């Protein structure tokens, strides 16, 4: 009997191994295709109309053209041999190609994601309900805003919309990657559905909310392909600074021959071009676009759709995060925490009647009571409750329970409601009921009174549990200089208790959705950038007001349209990770800019002595690297300038390692690593290249 079992397990394992191997093979193939496409695009981007968008690399391309033309003209210079011009021109060409490759590689990853999304779009037909009630089948591409469509079990939702009738389980794995279906129903904050998702049970009627080309998937494709990508304000500002530096160095190099002629010697044009290319910030100039695209790509891989690069950058500058208590800081389900008997009652009696009142209660609270009683080994008669008539919770009564066959009425519910119910039947109220209810409220819990007919037995202490690790995460945000504000509809006592347990900096109790706008504006008036999450229509104004608004994919269309980011997993706590990604993007750009500018120091000591040593022998003192010859020094500096770009591509794509710490600590750390490193690495790199080049010159 054992052998078949063993063989079966072996087959399953082999099957799993084959699946994993196939996934790895496909991933390698996709990476190979991306690299191949990026290499082709590197040459396509040499078009001056494309290159002029990056002024720094455009100057390098012009330098390539000049030196390439000079290599075919008769040389009147005795300072450099004939092969020097062509060598310089090819080094400059590869410098531009490496920069183009970095940008094309980042774009290629986005296009690969877009292709997978395009494959998820299938030819779908929709059952449209006409005004006369007739149902007509049309192509999804013919649907318009306002059309009413019926979607049955097993059918694909044809376009974005909102449920106006019915309830169904929807498989959103094509969009979110989450295999578990989600419930969509008419009304409330969970009525929004996305085109391309599948109804796996029941039937719903939806009203279409987007025209062709405007659906959620269409927007995702457009964004990840980069068609909708615009340069962010920080990127534009940095690009302006780098372009200004390039212009200044260009003026210096162009006017330099005037001074050298005055001193009685001439500098070859190719040497001047080499000097210019080595002085301008080509490293960050070649990687700047790739860093921005890769930042958007990292957010997308995290299952968050950013509507613009500006939103990702803003996340990195956030000073304050507004968080809902329910579902974000806490689990959102109040669970039975303990039982408190009143008067002379025992905990066994409270547990018995609490369980009987909850047997038919399918709410999370009801199930948690049963689990608690069973965990405490308190006995109760389940069959007695199952044979009775369930009394569901209503907003008017604020109670639920069961009427047993012998006429006994068991109830659990809000303190005031149960007390009134007991008093209406002639019962007396134990003195410690309100005292213990106040204690539970002060602890941040919710008290439910358990009563049978005209007698109160005790209270159930329901507690909305804080998610594990939240205190540590808020401490990390505090180290980053980010303030956390919890907004909740709870009373001040409950809010204060939860805030203390979770470790948030501030809280706003009895907060209505419209109050969030006031909280956001108050922070913005102090010059702070604010982030918040939301999913309901009533959250839309606040999401629009916030600098970073993260809407849940499960939320309403209004919320998603107001936000500048959408979380496909509908996990409100992800705002913390989004802030981290934004900071990583800004730090990567800043670190590589520092590294690029610091490089100039080493290149200065390489190329300046090489230019002037023959005419001014005293300049040899600046040759601290003891480079082989002037020509070797110039070529080594140019080669290092070119090679460093592809070497830094992985760092630009992945982002530098980020650890939560204060701004001053981060600045000091990055200056040490990328500032000092930007000085030391070129000295070593240029010297090594010079030793190799010296063998051939």
Swiss-Prot record:
GO CC terms of this entry: plasma membrane
Gene Ontology molecular functions: ATP binding; ATP hydrolysis activity; magnesium ion binding; P-type potassium transmembrane transporter activity
Active site location: 324 (4-aspartylphosphate intermediate)
Enzyme Commission number, as recorded: 7.2.2.6
Residue sites binding Mg(2+) per the record: 535, 539
Catalysed conversion reaction: K(+)(out) + ATP + H2O = K(+)(in) + ADP + phosphate + H(+)
Protein name from the UniProt record: Potassium-transporting ATPase ATP-binding subunit
Organism field: Bacillus cereus (strain AH187)
Lineage of origin: Bacteria, Bacillati, Bacillota, Bacilli, Bacillales
Gene: kdpB
């Amino acid at each position: 009997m054992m052998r078949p079992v063993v063989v079966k397990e072996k087959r399953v394992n082999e099957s799993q191994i084959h699946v994993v191997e196939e996934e790895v093979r496909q991933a390698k193939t996709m990476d190979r295709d991306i690299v191949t496409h990026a290499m082709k695009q590197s040459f396509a981007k040499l078009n001056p109309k494309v290159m002029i968008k990056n002024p720094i690399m455009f100057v390098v391309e012009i330098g390539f053209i000049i030196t390439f033309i000079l290599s075919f003209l008769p040389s009147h210079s005795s300072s450099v041999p004939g092969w020097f011009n062509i060598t310089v021109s090819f080094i400059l060409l590869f410098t531009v190609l490496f920069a183009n490759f970095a940008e094309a590689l980042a774009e290629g990853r986005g296009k690969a994601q877009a292709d997978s999304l395009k494959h998820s779009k299938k030819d779908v037909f929709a059952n449209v309900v006409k005004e006369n009630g007739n149902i007509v089948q049309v192509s999804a591409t013919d649907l318009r805003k306002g059309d009413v469509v019926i979607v049955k079990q097993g059918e694909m939702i044809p376009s974005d919309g909102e449920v106006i009738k019915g309830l169904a389980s929807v498989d959103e794995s094509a969009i979110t990657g989450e295999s578990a279906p989600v419930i969509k129903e008419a009304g409330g904050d969970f009525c929004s559905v996305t085109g391309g998702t599948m109804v796996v049970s029941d039937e719903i009627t939806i009203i279409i909310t987007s025209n062709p080309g405007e659906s959620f998937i269409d927007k995702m494709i457009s964004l990840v392909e980069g068609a909708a990508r615009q340069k962010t304000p920080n990127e534009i500002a940095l690009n302006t600074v780098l372009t200004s530096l390039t212009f200044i160095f260009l003026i210096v190099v162009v006017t330099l021959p005037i001074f050298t002629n005055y001193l009685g010697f001439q500098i070859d044009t190719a040497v001047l071009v080499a000097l210019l290319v080595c002085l301008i910030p080509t490293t960050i100039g070649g990687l700047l676009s790739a860093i921005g695209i890769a930042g958007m790509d990292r957010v997308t891989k995290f299952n968050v759709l950013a509507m613009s690069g500006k939103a990702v950058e803003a996340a990195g500058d956030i000073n304050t995060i507004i968080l809902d208590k329910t579902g974000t800081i806490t689990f959102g389900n109040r669970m039975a925490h303990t039982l408190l008997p009143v008067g002379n009652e025992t905990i066994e009696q409270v547990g018995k009647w609490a369980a009987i009142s909850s047997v038919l209660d399918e709410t999370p609270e009801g199930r948690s009571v049963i689990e608690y009683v069973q965990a405490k080994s308190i006995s109760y008669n389940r069959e007695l409750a199952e044979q009775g008539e369930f009394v569901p919770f209503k907003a008017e009564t604020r109670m639920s329970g069961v009427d047993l066959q012998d006429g006994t009425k068991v109830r659990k519910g809000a303190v005031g409601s149960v007390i009134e119910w007991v008093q209406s039947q002639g019962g007396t109220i134990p003195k410690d009921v309100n005292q213990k209810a106040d204690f539970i409220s002060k602890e941040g819990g919710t008290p439910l009174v358990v009563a049978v007919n005209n007698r109160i037995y005790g209270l159930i202490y329901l507690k909305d549990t804080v998610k594990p690790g939240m205190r540590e995460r808020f401490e990390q945000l505090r180290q980053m200089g980010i303030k956390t504000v919890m907004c909740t509809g709870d009373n001040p006592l409950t809010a204060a208790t939860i805030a203390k347990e979770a470790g948030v900096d501030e809280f706003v109790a009895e907060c209505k959705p419209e109050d969030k706008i006031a909280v956001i504006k108050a922070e913005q008036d102090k010059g702070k950038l604010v982030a918040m999450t939301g999913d309901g229509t009533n959250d839309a104004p606040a999401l629009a007001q916030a600098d970073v608004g993260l809407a849940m994919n499960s939320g309403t269309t209004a919320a998603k349209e107001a936000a500048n980011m959408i979380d496909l997993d509908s996990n409100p706590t992800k705002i913390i990770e989004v802030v981290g990604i934004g900071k990583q993007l800004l730090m990567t750009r800043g670190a590589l800019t520092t590294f690029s500018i610091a490089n100039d120091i080493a290149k200065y000591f390489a190329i300046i002595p090489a230019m002037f040593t023959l005419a001014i022998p005293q300049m040899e003192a600046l040759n601290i690297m003891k480079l082989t010859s002037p020509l070797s020094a110039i070529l080594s500096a140019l080669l290092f300038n070119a090679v460093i770009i592809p070497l830094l591509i992985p760092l630009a794509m992945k982002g530098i390692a980020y650890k939560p710490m204060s701004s001053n600590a981060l600045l000091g750390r990055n200056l040490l690593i990328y500032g000092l490193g930007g000085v030391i690495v070129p000295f070593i790199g240029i010297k090594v290249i010079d030793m190799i080049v010296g063998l051939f010159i």
